[in-house]
């Protein structure tokens, strides 16, 4: 391990715990045994774990130093792609850690999870009401999963009509994952450029919308942080050709409770736990990507 010189400034040089190993050091002492020992066969216990010998203060200082070098929303702006990363109130994390939620095993029988099931059922109603949609599913495990679920709903809707549409309109201001979700559903993405104001124009959508197009994927507010003020006219154009309007909720926290997505022409909308609401985005979770739909798509949930 390279030694740090006596210089000023921040030195990001922290050895691994195994490199700090000092034989004989101990961070925790067990009480003296008051019964006879009974050594177990090695086939049962396995090899002795390769844990380093460290004192408690060695471990505390190690992780404290590493935590001070970490960067996140508590220490500065977090511009991760097009995602809206914001400060998360600590009280929300405390509620999420309530034992009834955090301690419930996924395989518990329904007779032992009625409280959690009731909460989830009521949450579906709350999300439908605040978004202006008609039905909600909480099944998608994260935003990208919800996005894919939304596109599969559009695919299933057209299939039920005997229509095999092959294209989907994806604006240049849409969430970057949209083309991937469209591709997984067998759609070919048709790009549309935003206008000089950074939003979609109805004319640009009308030019590419036809009866081979399943719909449009709109992020609203878009990746530039601008509300798509022409969304009603755009939705009318798409609907007139039999298409559906999908809205990516990556930036929905800006308009949640303000814009009624159902009234402005959205057919399917996905939300993000870590963007629309306030759970930290890190380490791959925890995630949730509820999908909200209008009445015509409810049978396909």
Predicted regions and their residues:
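Conserved PLP-enzyme active-site core in the AAT-like
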Residues: 115-118, 145-301
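Conserved N-terminal alpha-helix of the aminotransferase class I/II PLP-enzyme fold
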Residues: 11, 16, 52-70, 99-141, ...
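Conserved phosphate/anionic-ligand binding catalytic regions in large, soluble enzymes, centered on
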Residues: 71-91, 139-147, 277-292
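Acyl-CoA thioester-binding alpha/beta core of soluble enzymes
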Residues: 31, 136, 149-152
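Short secondary-structure junctions and interdomain/linker hinges
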Residues: 66-77, 108, 130, 134, ...
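N-terminal glycine-rich, Lys/His-bearing helix-loop that initiates the first secondary-structure elements
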Residues: 1-103
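Short, surface-exposed helix-loop/turn micro-motifs enriched in polar/charged residues
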Residues: 75, 137-139, 160-162, 166
